[in-house]
Amino acid sequence: LAYTPGVAPPCLAIQEQPELSFTLTRRSNLVAVVTDGTAVLGLGDIGPEAGMPVMEGKCALFKAFADVDAFPLCIRSKDPDEIVRTVSLLAGSFGGINLEDIAAPRCFEIERRLQEVCDIPVFHDDQHGTAVVVAAALLNALRVVGKDIGQVRTVISGAGAAGISIGRHLL
């Protein structure tokens, strides 16, 4: 089954029912980690090649903590149209898309558009991952001091991808 002629039956089955690509291939366990290198950690716009070590590190975390295979895709474009087109054309090879270190405000449009055109989960880590961690930390801190979230005011400093998403998640 590793190669011809054994792969013909799965190929024909997927042709008839494309959703079988998730069970008859590695697709369901493969995530693309996508960046344009414009908001890499605290380093800023360092470019896609310089962002590769971070993307490789994220791929290693996927493997170590979830046994998910991940592949870095560092795109040499800051144009949302080109990024969306490139990722959407490659989406058939993956079970999910993890957007990483793409600067605001373009990251919002890119994520939204990819969610509209891809039939797999699309997640911008800098927005939602950070917001979930902040929400968990806030709820735990409130539990420690014995307060309800309705009793406090929360200040968010920054209006980048993380700050805006934190605000949206806390509302």
Provide a role label for each language-model segment.
Residues 1-122:
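N-terminal ligand-binding/catalytic initiation module
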